[in-house]
A protein has these predicted regions:
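Active-site cofactor/cluster-binding pocket
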Residues: 1-193
Length: 193
């Protein structure tokens, strides 16, 4: 990867979009990349729309601003398709990854003519099966890695097991559940168009 890759995350407060963007930044850093991972804060509350960003490159990153023309967009909550222009500035050569069970025709229509690639994944089903609760950020992290090719599946899994062991040292069942969610998501993300 020679070029700068820019990712914009759309989620709702409490869904873990910010955490996922920071985990992606850490994982990319650990593969030798230069990184940025940051949220955009306002007066948001639990459930309010939020935005987070990533920049990942093989070279030092000298730009320090929000991302207006991302290569990839991650939509953690598909209800945002009805109230946020998630494709704003999204490059046609990039892709959007949506947590959704809605049919492909609905997604294409909701994206208002976006011409690039569209992927979806059922992060709810994966997280509830793997973790016993709805935490969409872990499956969405794996999905964007798979779609973007920022790092290999193996690099992601190796980094995340270490990260989860540190974060959940006294909760091994949470480590196992998160690893299962990552593995499932890497296999289940599907191309819509």
């Amino acid at each position: 990867m020679d070029n700068l890759i820019e990712i914009r995350w759309h989620g709702r407060g409490g869904q873990g979009a910010k955490t996922a963007s920071l985990l992606l930044a850490d994982a990319a850093f650990n593969t030798g990349k230069y990184i940025q991972g940051f949220p955009e804060y306002g007066p948001e509350r639990m459930g309010a729309p939020i935005v987070a960003y990533n920049r990942i490159s093989d070279n030092p990153i000298t730009i320090h601003s929000n991302i207006y023309e991302p290569d990839y967009v991650v939509v953690v909550d598909d209800t945002l398709l009805e109230c946020v222009d998630v494709t704003s500035g999204l490059k046609k050569t990039g892709a959007i990854v949506i947590n959704s069970t809605k049919d492909n025709d609905y997604l294409k229509e909701a994206l208002k003519g976006y011409e690039g690639s569209v992927y979806k994944i059922d992060a709810r089903k994966i997280s509830e099966e793997a973790l016993g609760r709805y935490f969409p950020n872990t499956p969405m992290l794996a999905a964007i890695v798979k779609v973007s090719g920022i790092m290999s599946d193996e690099e992601l899994l190796n980094d995340m097991v270490g990260s989860f062991k540190h974060k959940f040292a006294k909760k091994p069942e949470v480590i196992d559940g998160n690893m299962k969610a990552l593995e499932m998501a890497l296999k289940q993300v599907e191309k819509v168009k």
